[in-house]
């Protein structure tokens, strides 16, 4: 259907000027009152007066009805051509054109009657043959997949050519696993050969990376690195943790502390920029060790 910007309530309401009764049921049921929306596309619309593109006010008085009656040709001829009907026509014509083109592409150019006669005669005989052909021709899903794989150069499609010796396995992924060189897993251990041993890699391959140095750990946490989160966290004893804690609170700057930490401790509360109070405190609610232990446990579970 053509979509027009008209307000249908207004401009689509037509009185047949002949009927004297203003809102009479007879005029309402007549064909001129069926709105364009309710109409089927394929219905012939030439009988109906067009909706003019210049909107006319709908009749409000008996006098207006009389005037409309005297007007030649059912009112003013529209300024623009009959927009709405024409659009419908065009859509129908387009449909027909498309149909014709598709027929032409399918090689059916003969007039219909001849075609139908031809079809009727040999129809019965080649039915069985067609069925057989269909069974032979119709490609299976795997065929289609393979076809498109050959069509597009994906990593997988070229894979069998690169490594013909691994093609004994039909599973490409496993073949890839077998042929891939061992990766150096990013770990903090000093030599990656030990880290890689669970992958079964050769030590000769990973020897190049043996020079790695583990990243420095903060001094206070180094004692408890291996400790996992447990329901009861051992309380910090005076002997071990207490002394460390005391010296961390002291103002004396030490080498392993970051500059930010030092400045934060040395500045008084009035000087310091106000961070959001709650956010600042929240980081102290969970003791650092516990948090780190929790992260470690998470990592070990995910691995």
From Swiss-Prot:
<dbReference type="GO" id="GO:0005884">
    <property type="term" value="C:actin filament"/>
</dbReference>
<dbReference type="GO" id="GO:0051015">
    <property type="term" value="F:actin filament binding"/>
</dbReference>
<dbReference type="GO" id="GO:0016476">
    <property type="term" value="P:regulation of embryonic cell shape"/>
</dbReference>
<protein>
    <recommendedName>
        <fullName>Protein bottleneck</fullName>
    </recommendedName>
</protein>
<dbReference type="GO" id="GO:0110069">
    <property type="term" value="P:syncytial embryo cellularization"/>
</dbReference>
<feature type="region of interest" description="Disordered">
    <location>
        <begin position="185"/>
        <end position="272"/>
    </location>
</feature>
<comment type="function">
    <text>Acts as a regulator of the microfilament network governing cellularization of the embryo. Determines the timing of a key conformational transition in the cortical microfilament network: the proper coordination of membrane invagination and basal closure of the cells. To do this, bnk possibly physically links neighboring contractile units of the early cycle 14 microfilament network in a manner that prevents basal constriction until the proper stage has been reached.</text>
</comment>
<keyword id="KW-0963">Cytoplasm</keyword>
<dbReference type="GO" id="GO:0005737">
    <property type="term" value="C:cytoplasm"/>
</dbReference>
<keyword id="KW-0206">Cytoskeleton</keyword>
<dbReference type="GO" id="GO:0005546">
    <property type="term" value="F:phosphatidylinositol-4,5-bisphosphate binding"/>
</dbReference>
<dbReference type="GO" id="GO:0061572">
    <property type="term" value="P:actin filament bundle organization"/>
</dbReference>
<dbReference type="GO" id="GO:0007015">
    <property type="term" value="P:actin filament organization"/>
</dbReference>
<feature type="compositionally biased region" description="Low complexity">
    <location>
        <begin position="185"/>
        <end position="197"/>
    </location>
</feature>
<dbReference type="GO" id="GO:0005547">
    <property type="term" value="F:phosphatidylinositol-3,4,5-trisphosphate binding"/>
</dbReference>
<feature type="compositionally biased region" description="Polar residues">
    <location>
        <begin position="260"/>
        <end position="272"/>
    </location>
</feature>
<dbReference type="GO" id="GO:0051017">
    <property type="term" value="P:actin filament bundle assembly"/>
</dbReference>
<keyword id="KW-0217">Developmental protein</keyword>
<feature type="region of interest" description="Disordered">
    <location>
        <begin position="102"/>
        <end position="142"/>
    </location>
</feature>
<feature type="compositionally biased region" description="Low complexity">
    <location>
        <begin position="115"/>
        <end position="138"/>
    </location>
</feature>
């Amino acid at each position: 259907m053509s979509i027009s910007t008209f307000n249908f309530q207004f401009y689509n309401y037509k009185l047949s000027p002949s009927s004297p009764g203003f809102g009479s049921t007879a005029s309402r049921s007549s064909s001129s009152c069926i709105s364009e929306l309710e109409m089927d596309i394929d219905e012939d619309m030439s009988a109906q007066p067009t909706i003019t593109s210049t909107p006319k006010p709908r009749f409000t008085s008996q006098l207006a009805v009389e005037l409309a009656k005297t007007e030649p040709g059912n009112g003013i001829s529209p300024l623009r051509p009959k927009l709405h009907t024409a659009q419908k026509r065009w859509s129908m014509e387009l449909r027909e054109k498309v149909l014709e083109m598709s027929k032409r592409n399918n090689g059916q150019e003969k007039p219909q009657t001849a075609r139908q006669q031809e079809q009727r005669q040999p129809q019965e005989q080649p039915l069985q043959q067609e069925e057989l052909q269909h069974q032979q021709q119709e490609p299976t899903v795997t065929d289609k997949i393979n076809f498109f794989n050959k069509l597009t150069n994906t990593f997988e499609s070229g894979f069998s050519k690169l490594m013909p010796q691994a093609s004994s396995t039909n599973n490409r992924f496993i073949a890839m696993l077998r042929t891939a060189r061992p990766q150096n897993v990013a770990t903090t251990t000093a030599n990656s050969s030990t880290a890689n041993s669970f992958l079964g890699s050769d030590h000769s391959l990973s020897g190049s990376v043996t020079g790695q140095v583990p990243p420095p750990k903060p001094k206070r946490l180094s004692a408890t690195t291996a400790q996992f989160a447990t329901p009861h966290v051992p309380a910090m004893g005076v002997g071990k943790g207490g002394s460390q804690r005391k010296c961390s609170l002291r103002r004396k700057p030490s080498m392993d502390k970051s500059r930010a930490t030092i400045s934060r401790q040395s500045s008084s509360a009035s000087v310091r920029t106000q961070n959001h109070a709650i956010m600042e405190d929240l980081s102290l609610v969970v003791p650092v060790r516990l948090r780190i232990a929790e992260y470690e446990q998470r990592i070990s579970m995910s691995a």
